[in-house]
A protein has these predicted regions:
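Active-site rim/loop-helix segments in enzyme catalytic domains that contact anionic ligands
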Residues: 1-101, 227, 239-246
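Metal-dependent de-N-acetylase/amidase catalytic core
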Residues: 2-8, 85-250
Length: 250
């Protein structure tokens, strides 16, 4: 029997995880694995009508409700929208967060995406995974001890990934797509904002189209794509693929 693992999905804003990997998290949760979800910011710029603190409070609660649908823990790292920078303080803060959560598997954003917060998150999380086991590296905002090892690191697709997206494998999320959709639907504050700012009329329908597009490439109805970090010193065992063998497509 496979031992229970702790999986952390950390992306820039509330709803990014739901769009890009909530189906995979639902499958893992259904197998009894522990799931944590972190947004780097509370989405404080995600409104044209509410002030930053008001919309941030709304979006934190939406993210909690979404996470609860798969019995996951939600936390916010409390950076601010458009203000995530790759620097020493941010790297130490994210390292401290990883030491507190103590995941064995980390899913994070693509290093090449449309939003600067997504790209900065990817770089910071990769650095933090490397730094978290180093006892002489002091984290910021946490006294948690170093991790025993570098976590297995995976990158999700970029938003609206095209034919040129580099992936190692897909996860067939067709069986849990209703859960993925319900998780994203908790972020109801974003419908008007995305329509006004992004030109997206229905964010649920848009997510479904994206997920179906990835599914066609995988030969299934709905899928999510992943790339494992194969850089020196990062774990190379395909642990996520092994946990979800029956759902993996290459």
């Amino acid at each position: 029997m496979t031992a229970t693992k702790h999986i952390l999905a950390i992306h820039a804003h509330p709803d990014d995880v739901e769009i890009l990997c909530a189906g995979t998290l639902a499958l893992l949760a259904g197998k009894g694995h522990r799931i944590s979800i972190v947004s780097m910011t509370p989405g404080d710029c995600g409104s044209a009508d509410r002030g930053p603190e008001e919309i941030a409070a709304v979006r934190r609660e939406e993210a909690r409700q979404s996470a609860q649908r798969i019995q996951a823990e939600y936390r916010c790292a409390e950076f601010r929208d458009l203000s995530i920078f790759v620097n020493d303080s941010a790297r130490r803060k994210v390292t401290g967060l990883l030491r507190e959560i103590r995941p064995e598997i980390v899913l994070t954003s693509s290093s090449a995406d449309y939003h600067c917060d997504h790209e900065a998150t990817s770089a910071l999380v990769q650095d933090a995974c490397f730094a978290a086991p180093a006892p002489n590296y002091a984290s910021e905002g946490s006294s948690a001890p170093p991790l025993p090892a570098i976590p297995h690191l995976y990158f999700v697709d970029r938003i609206e990934a095209g034919e040129d997206e580099q992936r190692d494998f897909f996860v067939d999320v067709s069986s849990v797509f209703p859960t993925k959709r319900a998780m994203l639907a908790e972020h109801r504050s974003q419908r008007d904002w995305l329509k006004k700012h992004h030109g997206i009329d229905d964010y649920l329908e848009q997510m479904e189209r994206w997920c179906a597009q990835v599914g066609r490439r995988a030969g299934v109805q709905y899928a999510e794509g992943f790339r494992q970090c194969h850089r020196h010193s990062y774990p190379q065992v395909p642990i996520l693929q092994e946990l979800l063998t029956e759902y993996v497509r290459v």
